[in-house]
Curated annotation (Swiss-Prot):
This is Aspartate--tRNA(Asp/Asn) ligase. The keyword Glycosyltransferase does not apply. The record marks H30 as: Important for tRNA non-discrimination. ATP binds at R224, D225, E226, Q233, E488, G540, L541, D542, R543. PROSITE patterns: AA_TRNA_LIGASE_II. It catalyses: tRNA(Asx) + L-aspartate + ATP = L-aspartyl-tRNA(Asx) + AMP + diphosphate. Residues 202-205 are annotated as: Aspartate. The keyword Protein biosynthesis applies. Signal peptide: none annotated. Keywords: Aminoacyl-tRNA synthetase, ATP-binding, Cytoplasm, Ligase, Nucleotide-binding, Protein biosynthesis.
Amino acid sequence: MRTHYCGQVNSNNIEETVNLCGWVDRRRDHGGVIFLDLRDRSGLIQIVSDPERTPDSYQIAGDIRNEYVVQITGRVSRRPEESLNPKLPTGEIEIYADDIQLLNGLGKQLPFQVSTAETEAVREELRLKYRYLDLRRERMTRNLLLRHEVIKAIRRFLEDEQNFVEIETPILTRSTPEGARDYLVPSRVHPGEWFALPQSPQLFKQILMVSGFDRYYQIARCFRDEDLRADRQPEFTQLDMEMSFMSQEEILQLNEKLVAYIFQKVKGIDLPLPFPRLTYTEAMERYGSDKPDVRFGLELVDVSDLMKDSGFKVFSGAIAKGGIVKVLPIPGGNDAISNVRIKPGGDLFKEASEVGAKGLAYVRVKEGGKIDTIGAIKDNLTDEQKQELLKRTNAQPGHLLLFAADDANTVNKTLDRLRLVIGEQLGLIDQDKISLLWVTDFPMFEWNEDEQRLEALHHPFTAPHPDDINDLKTARAQAYDLVFNGYEVGGGSLRIYQRDVQEKVFEAIGLSAQEADNKFGFLLEAFEYGTPPHGGIAYGLDRLVMLLAVEESIRDVIAFPKTQQAKCLLANAPSEVDKKQLKELHVSSISKAKS
């Protein structure tokens, strides 16, 4: 039916006859000649229908409306000089229609305009309900084609240049919770027993290392029943990788080359290698975050030792309870940030309180290095402490110093949030800049206050640092995250590959030997049969593509995403099912209460 895609026709095809198919993006009637913008996934091209050349086709063109599906046969011609459109890849040419076939029209009025000429925003709920229309729009088509190019680049690099093998792992597996709730699938054949959809291919890819497939990768579908945010979905896609006989350094270097390859092929950008690195401790101390956006400054300064003996009880009291005091120095903050914004009711106070802060303290640096404030800080600092504060923060006249005092977790969350908000508001973030860095040496465990136990910071299969093996509770993990402009886009580690070490880690997180054997016995047994040292990484593919596409939500780079309420508006899922189906599965449903 067609010889070319719309966006493929160019000046090299002048005088050729082509067959094109697609949707009418826009129709314009100019003095008896009708112009149609024909669109397919490759782009737009202008069609000219002249009644003097083809009266029958002109009649059809007169009845055509936006989003009609048509087939065009016509001759490629150069546009008149005054009609050239340099903004359009096909802007040098147009097609004089010899024949127009109407393949399909519209049975209903469009719920929103699809045309590339439309700039009016459409509600996301409407876009998701009519996703097939939304995906015709230029922006969404561009995003999905970008996603395709990213995956194509991944496969080419890993297979052609690095000798990786793509292997699929099971979708129906056993429930081995890894931090989030599992999606469960009842077994009809085994009444009372359940499969789970995988949160990741973690266990199976480690089994593949035992099996001798030393370089594995997979574009893997993963499922987590968790509360949703802008960058989370109940089902998502990972680039999953695992490698045997490689050190952490070798894994990081290989992945830097992979990411650089993707950027070069997809964006035409050459990334400098190697990527910068921060330890977890350095990242938390300087930025208050393990995924810092380092495109701008505003680094935090710990002043706990300076404030522990101050007369300001908010600070000294927090330190006495084992907390810390940190300050966020803001150049030009005196003029840019008013007192009202920092006090209760102000926008910065609200931002801080959302992450647990009880309040904010601040001082302003005036001419001559004079510290000015409303409150008790100034009056409870000695001249020596004031001078040391100015020295540590490198504060100059015009600086605003924002303080947070509480437990370390709350302080870091508070100042991390404020750093990002203020950096954005003051225009300090270069939106065109690309910042990639590794964060390494994470703690093995973190304390779960609700359950009063240790839990793995990443997952319990992460290998401890060899220097810390005798004290697992405070051990560093041989783990690493890749951070892209303040987003974690990849995370991995060297793995435990000895049964006794794995059992010690299970014990540290409160798993009994029986429970560990019940959940992970097949992995522990595999470790008895010559397991090689191995490690890996998984990338959040949706998030990576989101950042490459300069979008704000992963829903805009997924063909058929769920809403933040975990619903598919297109298919109206999830839905109730027939009682007969439930009976076959040996499952009964507890109906939700009617309001």
